[in-house]
Regions:
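Structural preference for solvent-exposed beta-strand-turn elements
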Residues: 1-226
């Protein structure tokens, strides 16, 4: 029996889709509201199938896929592009290419974190003697955020679902420095994770003097001095 809990924010994050999938596989999970804290009654691997909805987080599908071989599970995925969702597709590619019988495997650098350095290089591009270069940038095509350099300078509109993953937050942070108004769309999932990140971005950019408007799950940012 495993009892899981976390910091207060973790108790707010939605877990229902993952818990429902595990219950479909035959596992008993006790939770008052399908969030942490919860108790999992483990029974070892048991073959079965389930469907997981990734509308609120693709991490649910990635977690199940990584354990599926040992568990004997067949995983169906629905919501927000399903199995073609960028982070789910990356997980599937990793599972396919990882050497099951041992060996050497090169782990790619994290493109989401690397976006900060591309952003810094873009901001400083006109400053003499301040070059920023990023070595060994991922080129496998697995990481959606490896597209970040191609989004500089920022386009008029960027979608979290189709254009960038977590690095869209880096793009939002530098948007006030752009030469034109920029829109960032389909940001809803950012509200559900470490914090309410859409609100946090709008609030903190406004503190710096940026003009930011929030309409539904879209942020619109005007260029200007900070």
């Amino acid at each position: 029996v495993y009892r899981l809990s976390g910091v207060p924010r973790m108790h707010e994050r939605p877990q229902a889709a993952l818990l429902q999938a595990l219950r479909e596989l035959g596992y008993r999970i006790d939770s008052e509201n399908d969030k942490l804290p919860l108790t999992i009654h483990a029974e070892g691997p048991k073959a079965g199938s389930c469907t997981v909805n990734i509308t609120k987080s693709s991490q649910f599908a990635s977690a199940l896929l990584l354990a599926a071989d040992q568990g004997g599970w067949q995983i169906g995925i629905e919501g927000e592009q399903g199995a073609a969702s960028p982070y789910v597709a990356m997980t599937s590619s990793l599972i396919e290419y990882f050497p099951k019988s041992g060996g050497r495997f090169a782990i790619e650098p994290d493109a989401s974190g690397g976006s900060y350095f591309w952003a810094a290089g873009h901001i400083l591009s006109g400053e003499e003697g301040l070059p920023v270069k990023v070595a060994r940038w991922p080129r496998s095509g697995w990481q959606i955020d490896a597209e970040f350099p191609s989004c500089l300078p920022l386009p008029v509109q960027t979608s979290r679902q189709d254009d960038l993953g977590d690095s869209i937050m880096t793009a939002i942070a530098i948007a006030p420095l752009a030469k034109r108004k920029t829109e960032f769309t389909e940001l809803g999932r950012l509200r559900l994770q470490e914090c309410e990140r859409v609100e946090a971005l709008r609030t903190e950019l406004a503190k710096c003097g940026a003009v930011v408007s929030e309409t539904g799950d879209t942020l619109t940012i005007q260029p200007g001095l900070l």
